[in-house]
A protein has these predicted regions:
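Intrinsically disordered, low-complexity RNA-binding regions enriched in Gly/Arg/Ser/Tyr
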Residues: 1-38, 43-57, 63-101
Length: 101
């Protein structure tokens, strides 16, 4: 209950971060930067890798320079064929401070 109250009292920032799923494992950060640049200025790209093996997990986070550009990228690129796979592109969820195992 207390945690919910803290979350509800926080100011919500415009979300400029995008979740990108179903990525081919050979995708590089420059590949994604080039792809997402068609929707606006890309601030950062982070391809998620397995902690133990260092291998890509097939997902990434891309941060655009504005919320408008993030929404544009989502509408332009969701379900787009990229290197033989259909991407899942959506707004990244805001972290609540939890971390995986």
């Amino acid at each position: 209950m207390i945690r919910t109250e803290k979350i509800m009292n926080k100011k919500i920032k415009p979300n400029k971060k995008i979740y990108v799923g179903n990525l081919p494992f050979e995708t590089t950060e420059p590949d994604l930067k080039t792809l997402f640049s068609s929707a606006g200025d890309v601030m950062s790209v982070n391809i998620v890798k397995d902690r133990q093996t260092g291998q890509p997990r097939g997902l990434a986070f891309v941060e655009m320079s504005s919320q408008w550009e993030a929404r544009r990228a989502i509408s332009m690129l969701n379900r787009t064929n990229f290197m033989g796979k259909n991407l899942l592109v959506k707004e990244a969820r805001t972290s609540l401070g939890f971390r995986g195992r």
